[in-house]
Amino acid sequence: MIKIETIEVAGLAGALTALRLPYGKEVRSKMYTTIKHWQEGIDDPYHVWKNGAEVEINNRDLALMQTLVKRGDEHAKVVRGINVWAKIYAPIFLLREIETYRFGRERLASESTMHQQCRGLSGDELVKAKSELPMGTMQLTVDMFSYQTLRRIVIQRSNHRLPEWHTFIDWVRTLPLADELIFCGLNEDN
């Protein structure tokens, strides 16, 4: 069974800052950002990275973003800046279909079939084992998606025959501002 876990959502402050630039206007929303990095001591093995933004979205900014999203990708460039990182545990066949989305999606890493299912094999034995892996083999990946790409996936896959796509779209619905910036203007069927 497919499982998707949101790791992080970021970029709203940057997207809002860019929103009104084409017309030389200032952002109306209020943003408070924090970026700090420190290490407690020389022997401390951990670095602390604190990165965050508190955003109070002005209703007119949100309405403008929705208007641009509804007009299409060429107008909705601003939502490319809002990104989500997720752990996806899914069959290889779904992961291959997700790879259709080359822009606004990046696979940061995936479990290695060579280091896990085919551990200790080499040469012809390794090639044979990898070529015989079933497409239904479950694999864990970490992927990054822009909100613009997630909207495209929702539009293109909402009526797909594979039930895994419906689970994926259900996950998209859980994201912050998904109704406002991903699903806005779409039919209730999506």
What are these language model-derived features?
Residues 1-190:
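Family-specific signature for flavin-dependent thymidylate synthase
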